[in-house]
């Protein structure tokens, strides 16, 4: 039996909750063995992560960089669910303290679940480009100053 809307939303929200904790193993437990993570827009130049090991390194980098990290569905937005395609679209707010100061941004996450609706098979992340560009410069300056 295909997953229900409620099951798909539950998996998506649980994934976001674990992502916000930056508990790498918990985040990875929600990813199917063949999960692909993609960041958009393409102009950000971030390659797709094709394996759990690549994803693990990426999530570990976030954990090392952020403190008090928060991810949540933006107030006033509701998940958009395509049950036959097993997709959930979320408007996410991200906040936290980092090595280079306070971080606040928005994302659109498109999560496609496995046939059971229990794991993420594809994770598409659309980032706020203006914030990402500004942060890229701050991060670059931070690490340049350390070298």
Curated annotation (Swiss-Prot):
A Gene Ontology BP annotation from the UniProt entry: terpenoid biosynthetic process
Pathway(s) this gene product operates in, as recorded in its UniProt entry: Secondary metabolite biosynthesis; terpenoid biosynthesis
Listed InterPro entries: Fungal_Meroterpenoid_Isomerase, NTF2-like_dom_sf
Self-association and partners: Homodimer.
Other comment: In A.calidoustus, the austinoid gene cluster lies on a contiguous DNA region, while clusters from E.nidulans and P.brasilianum are split in their respective genomes. Genetic rearrangements provoked variability among the clusters and E.nidulans produces the least number of austionoid derivatives with the end products austinol and dehydroaustinol, while P.brasilianum can produce until acetoxydehydroaustin, and A.calidoustus produces the highest number of identified derivatives.
Family annotation (PANTHER family): AUSTINOID BIOSYNTHESIS CLUSTERS PROTEIN F-RELATED, AUSTINOL SYNTHESIS PROTEIN F-RELATED
Function: Part of the gene cluster that mediates the biosynthesis of calidodehydroaustin, a fungal meroterpenoid. The first step of the pathway is the synthesis of 3,5-dimethylorsellinic acid by the polyketide synthase ausA. 3,5-dimethylorsellinic acid is then prenylated by the polyprenyl transferase ausN. Further epoxidation by the FAD-dependent monooxygenase ausM and cyclization by the probable terpene cyclase ausL lead to the formation of protoaustinoid A.
Family: Belongs to the trt14 isomerase family.
Protein name per its UniProtKB record: Austinoid biosynthesis cluster protein H
């Amino acid at each position: 039996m295909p997953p229900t809307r409620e099951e798909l939303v539950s998996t998506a929200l649980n994934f976001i909750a674990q992502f916000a904790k930056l508990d790498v193993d918990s985040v990875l437990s929600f990813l199917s063995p063949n999960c692909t993570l993609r960041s958009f827009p393409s102009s950000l130049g971030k390659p797709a992560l094709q394996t759990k090991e690549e994803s693990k390194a990426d999530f570990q980098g976030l954990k090392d960089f952020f403190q008090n990290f928060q991810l949540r569905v933006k107030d006033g937005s509701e998940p958009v669910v395509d049950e036959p395609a097993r997709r959930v679209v979320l408007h996410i707010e991200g906040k936290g303290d980092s090595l280079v100061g306070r971080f606040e941004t928005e994302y659109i996450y498109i999560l496609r679940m496995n046939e059971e609706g229990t794991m993420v098979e594809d994770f598409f992340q659309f980032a706020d480009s203006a914030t990402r560009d500004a942060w890229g410069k701050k991060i670059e300056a931070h690490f340049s100053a350390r070298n």
